[in-house]
A protein has these predicted regions:
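N-terminal signal-anchor transmembrane segment
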Residues: 1-57, 72-81
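Long extracytoplasmic/lumenal interhelical loops at the membrane interface
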Residues: 27-33, 256-330
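A membrane-periplasm/extracellular boundary helix in multi-pass inner-membrane enzymes
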Residues: 80, 133-136, 230-271
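Alpha-helical transmembrane segments of multi-pass inner-membrane proteins
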Residues: 118-144, 161-214, 218-231
Length: 339
């Protein structure tokens, strides 16, 4: 057993894993297990750069180096324009990403980073699913509570955490700040696995395990994923859909509150013109209004979440137009330039 895991017990894999848990939306620092995420980001940056220098990792081609420089100077410009030091966090993370990419290139372009990420998401999805079944069976209770970043209570169950635990309803957030975050990053893991790693076991475990997030967005994104990759294999689509529905019904059948809380989220809400579980459309509309008011350079990342903006436009949480509202057209170009 030890012989199988010994190749992974080295600094490189520690660096990979630390990059997954160093900061928000992971909650380890909120539970007091790690320093504040800003400290973790600096530590991650120093460790990644030190590894690159000590191992003398090779350089990227000039176009890639130029892209990194444009982004770095672009965010410095935004920090000065908006008087916002949070843009320096982006620079640190950008340079850290650059360093980790160089490490992977030095390893012959291996997929070790992607594989490690996929396994980490599978662990959260499956352990959370097991934990939820134990909670619903009355065999598991919260070990302790902690305060989430938005000041709501979070619950640590040992196998998973969640910010949704009331009235018989419990959802798996893994070790992220909310179930939707686990579902969001889980979809990334699915796509990475399908396109590069191609591990069928990982794919099945992710698809089934992420059901425990009970995220409406997950099921919408999963439907798109299945149509893109399995549209020519109708029997697989039917089989996967059947497994998902049976698993869902099994989980939600434990109590009436959970059943209505989940299936009720797919009911049409006439007051909003969308399904009851849609909690992003309003946020997207607000951010789109802000973008229309500040189209070129945006409002600034920190300004966007200020009380003044909340009183004028309403609360703006994570959504597709958040970065557009914060950074405008110029910021969007800088962000998506590597694509």
């Amino acid at each position: 057993m030890f012989e199988k895991i010994r190749p992974y017990l080295n600094f490189r894999y520690f660096l990979y894993f630390f990059s997954f848990i160093a900061g928000w939306p992971c909650v380890f620092y909120l539970m007091g297990w790690l320093p504040h995420y800003t400290v973790n980001y600096v530590l991650l940056f120093v460790m990644a750069m030190s590894y690159v220098i000590i191992r003398k990792c090779g350089q990227f081609d000039k176009p890639i180096n130029d892209l990194i420089l444009i982004q770095v100077f672009g965010w410095i410009f935004f920090s000065l324009i908006h008087m916002d030091t949070s843009y320096y966090t982006r620079i640190i993370l950008l340079l850290t990403t650059f360093a980790i990419l160089r490490i992977q290139q030095d390893e012959g372009g291996s997929l070790d980073f992607c594989k490690t990420y996929d396994v980490w998401l599978v662990v959260q999805a499956i352990s959370g699913t097991i934990g939820i079944l134990l909670v619903l069976g009355g065999l598991l209770q919260p070990i302790f509570k902690f305060v989430e970043m938005d000041m709501r209570p979070g619950y640590f169950f040992g196998l998973f955490t969640t910010n949704t635990y009331f009235g018989g309803l419990v959802r798996n957030a893994g070790f992220y700040d909310e179930p939707g975050a686990l579902a969001f990053w889980g979809i990334y893991a699915l796509i990475i696995n399908k396109m590069f790693v191609k591990n069928t076991k990982i794919e099945i475990l992710l698809i089934v395990g992420l059901i425990s997030t009970m995220s409406v967005a997950y099921f919408i994104q999963l439907a798109i994923y299945l149509l893109v990759f399995y549209r020519k294999q109708s029997w697989k689509l039917i089989m996967i859909a059947a497994v998902i529905l049976i698993t869902l019904k099994f989980i939600t059948s434990y109590n009436e509150a959970m059943d209505s809380a989940f299936w009720g989220r797919f009911q049409y809400d006439e007051s909003t013109g969308t399904i009851s579980g849609d909690n992003r459309s309003v946020l997207m509309e607000r951010c789109w209004r802000i973008f229309c008011d500040y189209p070129i350079l945006g409002m600034g990342a920190r300004n966007l979440v200020s009380p003044e903006v909340a009183s004028k436009y309403g609360f703006v949480g994570a959504n597709f137009f958040f970065n557009w509202a914060a950074d405008g057209i110029v910021g969007a170009i800088i962000t998506y330039l590597p694509l």
